[in-house]
């Protein structure tokens, strides 16, 4: 039977760790760099006894009830065993002692230290000491001859010496090791060992083999090696019977040889490849306890029988099968269980010549095709090396029959056999876990700790219960539940408590929800899963619950217990988290190699419009790490933490990528310290976690205290002022992306928070620009200005001008113009997208009034109604062009005059995007925002309804079109009733409109309403220049069809003009505006009121009959009409 490896468990903090058995084999004793000696009853002992012997313990030895330790205060101490009572100090050194061993009867100890000395001390009388001098470097290891005649020692000076104890002389010295100046720099600690009982052989690990020397003659007998050994051997130890020798390497390989036959009996690989630094053979049975350089403790069982025979008469494990077993999902997933402590049997490599019939069966693939033997073995199984037959024929023995078919013969392993390819090795899959929980094997554990509360589980002899505690007791009071169904998974939200248990032979896996926020009397529900399907992960959201099962299914439920969607996962689930409408799933998307996990992530939104944000993208992890925590920030951004302490957050502003925002290991004082994350906040920026000294998770008692860590992005040169400001700027950007997400999805947030963040970011950019300007990095200044808002760019231009950086100021001015043009182009595109969207909604339903049909017309009607209500006590009907499409490109919000029906040019209300204004509060105003602002300024007593509707036209605040249903008001409803679209109008309606029109026109002879005239701005010099040169631009560029192209070309030509020419055009614009105003005033005085009324009646009738055919007037006409109306006010 091959050796069985049990999963390793945490023993001590990271560093050199040693292990030994007591005389009876009842206890395993370990010591480590944490200064503790732990006494384990077995590997499953969850509460080992410990003795603190000092700050660090470098070595320990146990014999006859005496525990001897070499500690960091340069002493060799004695404690009673197992009581752990101090029993004095045996000896002292000037530096640390590196190794201590007992002799055969336990009366003496030998210790070697870094001061080059070796001492033998009598345990009962510490004054009886012998000192051995001769090494020229620190002593690595020691070993007593079983007959107490010789003492062997290895040193950093590269030599292995054998001392005559009686006269303290060196009997022999071999230069076998690499030289070094300290133990920490030694490639191997070279733990050598004498053969028990007879002391016939001395085993020394040298490089990749074990050298054996004969006693007294000191001749080299032979080497023990294996083709699987790829790294230096660190330690050797003999079985109590003296027939087997075990060795451990610095890459985690443990090999056992039969010394007599030189056969390799067992090969076992450390599950994580850590260096083996402690090996101890059980005194009575075939068990080997081992420790690694990370402080972990492991155990091999059924290694070899102490009587000299293997524990199984036949070698049933074959190398081909072992290689296939590496990819066995069930066994390997248990082998790398980070959170569960169940024993896993992993067969080791055992040598043997394979029977032909059995070999054919084992070489069959899952698909039914035979595996090519050439991929596994170099030679046929029937071919045997001649040299092997000559040297091993005397060792060929036929084994006893044990009921199995065929006979298998053991032959010595020869170097001519080609080794199997050992890499890359697949990484054991991480088992499912619940974020905020501690391991299942603990009797008192946290089932979950999150921002809502804590769920503890107690499973001991007295009680099996679950306690629920809320951080805010106003949500719910603390609850105590009996755990009769053995619930192992839990989650907690402000609405419910969710529990799940695995299936048993009698009961199915269950999902239990305690819906304490329900308004009815039924506060809980339970759902049984189908047979052979277990719940592996659960989570709660707002109004829903989710459970991932072993059948690779994810089941969704309402919080009240209604089953909803069920869909398949692409791999076994690792963990889940929920927040609001978001569901965050991490699963295995493949097999990882060389210690890396291969995980995928899905992010779904389960609102009314269900959609998937992340479609199984790979989840980035630190090398050789695993997932430790997933969840959401308090603001709803997905985050996760790996076992190396790296916290990553979803960066929605960079294509949903993952950005590392904190390294918790930087805040740890010791190498074995960790932080256990319980929550993340973006505003304020806080990482809430629990410090764990010497562990990865906290105990339940005493109640752990939560610490707050700050975030820091891993930017370069963080010690410099430039690096600090860059890190602060991008951290501010990342941690305020959630505001855009909230606005996009219709959630409420404080506008002041966003304004404060923008202000903070612009201040950092200005500081970086000033720093770059001082360092003569003008190109870098322009790059920084590209990240600024329009106002900040204006400040940057002023700063550059005052700093006499004229070229920089010119570049920044060009950048400001480009940013304004880009902003205008973006707004035009958004308007076109909005029009296309609404056209699609109205496609095929041109005569059907919808909520999207004419929102701009609604706004106009409501504004006119408000104005008319303020001007007159009576409501008066107004004229609008029937059947006009508000969303066509030829018209917009300002193209139809509400009172007169006159048409104005569509760009009259738009701010010049190419004019840089330092006094403006916003970088640039879109047409809609400018229009809304002016309307709000005019409406002194504006209602909530009109305000809400005007806000919908602001593209900056509402990037996504969403219908707003206004509350009905009698006044506005009556005013709007005059403007409903009708396909057929009666003569009576026309007559009523004509009469009302006469009354309106007689009282108000204006051409345009006040709210539209206030949007008119004086012409600029560039506009007048563009009017006169438009024909030249079109003749030079006949392919120009878009007004934006004409304006851009005009800007380029206008910049070429000299300063004097530009001033001439500017003065011309001012003069024309003034003259137009004067002319309007004169016309108002001259025109006779009666004649004007008749003319207006005729024009109104024409407009009513020809409203659909009328085209917009040219630019100059609209300008004059607007100015005329403005002056009439």
Curated annotation (Swiss-Prot):
Alphabetized GO MF terms: chromatin binding; DNA binding
Q: Where are the WD repeats?
A: 11-50, 52-91, 92-131, 134-173, 184-223, 228-267, 271-310
Composition-biased stretches, type Basic and acidic residues, lie in: 988-997
Q: What positions are modified (Phosphoserine)?
A: 333, 374, 383, 387, 868, 917, 919, 932, 984, 1041, 1090
Q: Where is this region: Disordered?
A: 848-897, 916-1017, 1068-1113
Q: Does the keyword Oxidoreductase apply?
A: no
From its record, what is one biological process in GO terms? DNA repair
Q: Which subcellular locations apply to this protein?
A: Nucleus, Nucleoplasm
| Record location of the Glycyl lysine isopeptide (Lys-Gly) (interchain with G-Cter in SUMO2) cross-link | 397, 1127
| Subunit (UniProt) | Trimer. Interacts with the polymerase alpha catalytic subunit POLA1. Interacts with MCM10. Interacts with DNA2. Interacts with CDC45 and GINS2 subunit of GINS complex; these interactions associate WDHD1 with the CMG helicase complex.
Could you tell me what this protein does?
Answer: Core replisome component that acts as a replication initiation factor. Binds directly to the CMG complex and functions as a hub to recruit additional proteins to the replication fork.
**Protein name as annotated:** WD repeat and HMG-box DNA-binding protein 1
Write the gene name: WDHD1
């Amino acid at each position: 039977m091959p050796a069985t490896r049990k999963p390793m468990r945490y023993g001590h903090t990271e560093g050199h760790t040693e292990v030994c058995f007591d005389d009876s084999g009842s206890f395993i004793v370990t010591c480590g760099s944490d200064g503790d000696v732990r006494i384990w009853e077995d590997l499953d002992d969850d509460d080992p006894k410990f003795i603190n012997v000092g700050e660090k313990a470098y070595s320990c030895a146990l014999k006859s009830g005496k525990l001897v330790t070499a500690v960091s205060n340069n002493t060799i101490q004695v404690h009673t065993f197992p009581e752990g009572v101090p029993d004095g100090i045996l000896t002292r050194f000037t530096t640390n002692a590196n190794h201590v061993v007992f002799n055969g009867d336990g009366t003496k100890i030998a210790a070697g230290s870094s001061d080059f000395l070796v001492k033998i001390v009598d345990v009962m009388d510490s004054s009886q000491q012998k000192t051995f001098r001769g090494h020229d470097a620190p002593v690595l290891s020691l070993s007593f001859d079983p007959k107490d005649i010789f003492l062997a020692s290895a040193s950093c000076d590269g030599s292995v010496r054998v001392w005559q104890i009686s006269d303290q002389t060196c009997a022999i010295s071999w230069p076998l090791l690499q030289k070094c100046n300290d133990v920490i720099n030694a490639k191997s600690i070279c733990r050598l060992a004498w053969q028990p009982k007879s002391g016939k052989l001395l085993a020394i690990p040298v490089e990749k083999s074990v050298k054996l020397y004969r006693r007294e003659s000191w001749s080299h007998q032979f080497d023990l090696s294996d083709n699987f050994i790829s790294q230096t051997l660190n330690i050797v130890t003999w079985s109590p019977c003296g027939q087997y020798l075990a060795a451990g390497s610095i890459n985690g390989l443990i090999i056992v040889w039969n010394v007599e036959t030189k056969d390799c009996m067992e090969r076992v690989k450390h599950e994580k490849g850590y260096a083996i630094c402690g090996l101890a053979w059980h005194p009575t049975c075939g068990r080997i306890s081992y420790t690694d350089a990370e402080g972990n403790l492991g155990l091999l069982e059924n290694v070899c029988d102490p009587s000299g025979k293997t524990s199984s008469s036949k070698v049933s494990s074959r190398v081909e099968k072992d290689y296939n077993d590496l990819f066995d999902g069930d066994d390997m997933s248990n082998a790398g269980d980070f959170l569960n402590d169940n024993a896993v049997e992993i067969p080791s490599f055992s040598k043997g010549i394979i029977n032909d019939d059995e070999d054919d069966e084992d070489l069959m693939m899952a698909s039914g095709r035979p595996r090519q033997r050439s991929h596994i073995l170099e030679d046929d199984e029937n071919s045997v090396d001649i040299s092997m037959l000559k040297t091993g024929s005397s060792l060929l023995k036929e084994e006893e029959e044990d009921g199995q078919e065929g006979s298998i013969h053991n032959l010595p392993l020869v170097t001519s056999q080609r080794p199997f390819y050992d890499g890359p090795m697949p990484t054991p899959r991480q088992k499912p876990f619940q974020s905020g929980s501690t391991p299942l094997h603990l009797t008192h554990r946290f089932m979950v700790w999150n921002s809502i509360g804590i769920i503890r589980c107690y499973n001991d002899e007295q009680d099996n219960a679950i306690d629920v505690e809320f951080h805010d007791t106003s949500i719910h009071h603390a609850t105590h539940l009996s755990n009769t169904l053995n619930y192992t998974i839990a989650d907690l939200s402000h609405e419910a408590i969710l529990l799940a248990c695995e299936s048993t032979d009698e009961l199915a896996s269950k999902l239990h929800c305690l819906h304490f926020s329900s308004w009815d009397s039924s506060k809980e529900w339970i759902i049984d899963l189908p047979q052979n399907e277990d719940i592996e992960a659960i989570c709660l959201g707002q109004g829903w619950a989710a459970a991932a099962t072993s059948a690779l299914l994810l089941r969704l439920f309402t919080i009240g217990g209604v089953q909803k969607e069920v869909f398949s996962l692409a791999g076994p689930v690792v963990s889940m988290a929920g927040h609001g409408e978001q569901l965050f799933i991490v699963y295995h998307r493949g097999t990882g190699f060389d210690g890396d996990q291969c995980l995928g992530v899905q992010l779904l939104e389960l609102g009314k419009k269900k959609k998937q944000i992340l479609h199984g993208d790979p989840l980035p992890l630190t090398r050789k790490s695993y997932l430790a925590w997933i969840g959401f920030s308090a603001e709803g951004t997905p985050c996760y933490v790996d076992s190396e302490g790296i916290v990553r957050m979803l960066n929605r502003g960079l294509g949903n990528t993952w950005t590392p925002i904190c390294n918790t290991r930087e805040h740890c004082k010791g190498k074995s310290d960790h932080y256990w994350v319980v929550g993340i906040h973006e505003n304020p920026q806080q990482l809430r976690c629990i410090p764990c000294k010497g562990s990865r998770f906290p105990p339940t008692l005493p109640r752990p205290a939560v610490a707050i860590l700050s975030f820091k992005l891993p930017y370069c040169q963080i010690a410099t002022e430039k690096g600090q400001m860059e890190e602060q700027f991008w951290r501010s950007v990342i941690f305020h992306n959630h505001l855009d997400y909230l606005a996009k999805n219709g959630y409420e947030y404080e506008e002041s928070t966003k304004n404060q963040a923008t202000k903070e970011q612009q201040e950092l950019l200005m500081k970086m620009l000033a720093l770059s300007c001082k360092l003569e990095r003008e190109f870098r200044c322009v790059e920084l200005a590209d990240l600024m808002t329009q106002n900040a760019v204006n400040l940057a231009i002023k700063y550059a001008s005052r700093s006499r950086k004229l070229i920089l100021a010119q570049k920044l001015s060009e950048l400001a113009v480009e940013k304004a043009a880009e902003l205008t182009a973006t707004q035009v595109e958004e308007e076109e997208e909005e029009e296309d969207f609404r056209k699609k909604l109205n496609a095929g339903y041109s005569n059907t009034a919808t909520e999207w049909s004419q929102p701009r017309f609604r706004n106009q009607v409501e504004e006119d109604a408000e104005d008319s209500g303020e001007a007159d006590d009576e409501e008066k009907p107004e004229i609008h062009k029937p059947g006009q499409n508000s969303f066509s490109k030829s018209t917009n919000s300002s193209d139809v005059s509400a009172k007169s029906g006159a048409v104005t040019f569509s760009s009259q209300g738009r701010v010049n995007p190419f004019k840089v204004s330092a006094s403006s509060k916003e970088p640039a105003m879109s047409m809609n925002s400018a229009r809304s602002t002016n309307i709000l300024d005019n409406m002194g007593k504006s209602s909530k309804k009109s305000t809400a509707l005007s806000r919908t036209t602001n593209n900056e605040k509402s990037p996504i079109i969403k219908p707003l249903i206004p509350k009905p008001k009698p006044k506005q409803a009556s005013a709007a009733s005059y403007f409903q679209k009708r396909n057929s109008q009666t003569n009576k309606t026309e007559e009523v409109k004509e009469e009302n029109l006469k009354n309106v026109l007689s009282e108000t002879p204006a051409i345009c309403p006040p709210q539209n005239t206030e949007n008119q701005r004086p012409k600029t010099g560039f506009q007048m220049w563009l009017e006169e040169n438009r024909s030249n631009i079109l003749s030079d560029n006949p392919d120009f069809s878009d007004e934006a192209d004409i304006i851009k070309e005009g800007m380029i030509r206008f910049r070429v003009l000299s300063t004097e020419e530009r001033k001439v055009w500017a003065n011309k614009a001012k003069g024309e505006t003034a003259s137009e105003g004067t002319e309007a005033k004169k016309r108002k005085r001259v025109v006779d009121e009666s004649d004007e009324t008749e003319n207006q009646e005729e024009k109104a009738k024409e407009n009513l009959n020809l409203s659909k055919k009328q085209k917009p007037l040219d630019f100059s006409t609209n300008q004059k009409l607007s100015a005329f109306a403005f002056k009439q006010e």
